[in-house]
Amino acid sequence: LSPTHWQASTFPMPFRSKITVVHDGIDTQAVAPNPAVSLTLNDNLVLTKQDEVITFVNRNLEPYRGYHVFMRALPEILKCRPGARILIVGADDVSYGARPRPEEHGGTKWKDIFAAEVRPQISEADWGRVYFLGNLPYQHFIPLLQLSTVHVYLTYPFVLSWSLLEAMSAGCAIVASDTQPLHEAVRHNETGKLVNFFNHEALAQQVCNLLDQPEERQRLGASARAFAQQHYDLHGVCLPQQLAWVNALRSSDSVVGEVKPKAPLA
C-alpha cells in the first residue's frame, strides 16, 4: 500500500504495478467547519471567525516543510494586513531534513535562525501579532484549523502531511507550494492556490489577495472540504479500501493454501 500516487511513483518500475494507492484516511466528520469556533491565546486574547488569522502548521519548523519561505513572506504579509494574526504551530526540532550547522547558519534551531533573519524587517508592534504555539494537543489543533482565514502549507517533494488534508476537511482557504506531491490534493483555483515554493514574494501576495476575497475563500474552502470527503474520508472511503485490500490478500493466501505440498523425498 502507498498513501499517495506520488509516493508510489518513487518505486522502481517493476514494483509500481503491484502497489495499491490508498490513503490512511482522516475523520472528516470530526474535522469540519465550525462558524462558532473560538480560540484563546495567552489566556487573554480570544480569536473568532471575525478575526483575520493566518495559520502555518508543521510537526517541526524546518526548511523541508517551507518554514524559511513562510518566514521570509511574513514582513510583507504583516505590512499589508495590519490586523492579521499569524499562528505558527510546530516544535523547534527537525523531522525530515538536516539540522543546521552553527558555523554556517548561525544557530542550532531552524526556528530561531529564520526568525532572526526576518526580525529586523518587522516592527515590535507587528512582531507582537506573530504567535509561536509549539506543538498543540489535538483538541486545540482542530479549532485552530477551523479558525483559519488562510492556511499556508509548503513542502519539498515529500509525503503529504495529515495537517494539509485536515485543513482541507476543516474548509480552510489554502495557499500551498506548487510541488508535485501537492497536485493530488490542492488543485490551483479549485481546492486552493498554488505558488512557487521558493518565491516568498508570490506567497505573500497570494495570501494578501485571498484575504481581500471572502467569497473566493468560501468557494475554495468548500471545494477543499468536498475533495477531502470524496478522496480521504476514513470511514467512507479509505478504511473500506484498506479492508478490501486485506481481504484480497486473504483470498490469495487461501488459494495458495489449497495447493498440495510435494511429497517428501525418500
Mark where each language-model region is.
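Conserved acidic donor-binding segment of nucleotide-sugar-dependent glycosyltransferases
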Residues: 188-189, 193-200, 209-214
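Short hydrophobic beta-strand element within catalytic cores of glycosyltransferases
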Residues: 173-176, 186
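Donor nucleotide-sugar binding/catalytic pocket of nucleotide-sugar-dependent glycosyltransferases
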Residues: 1-50
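Nucleotide-activated donor-binding/catalytic signature segment of Leloir-type glycosyltransferases, i.e.
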Residues: 90, 99-139
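C-terminal alpha-helical cap of glycosyltransferases
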Residues: 234-266
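Conserved donor-binding/catalytic core segment of Leloir-type glycosyltransferases
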Residues: 1, 43-65, 71-76, 86-89
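A short, well-ordered alpha-helix in the C-terminal region of glycosyltransferases
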Residues: 202, 209, 216-231, 237, ...
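Aromatic "clamp/platform" in nucleotide-sugar-dependent glycosyltransferases that forms part
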Residues: 156
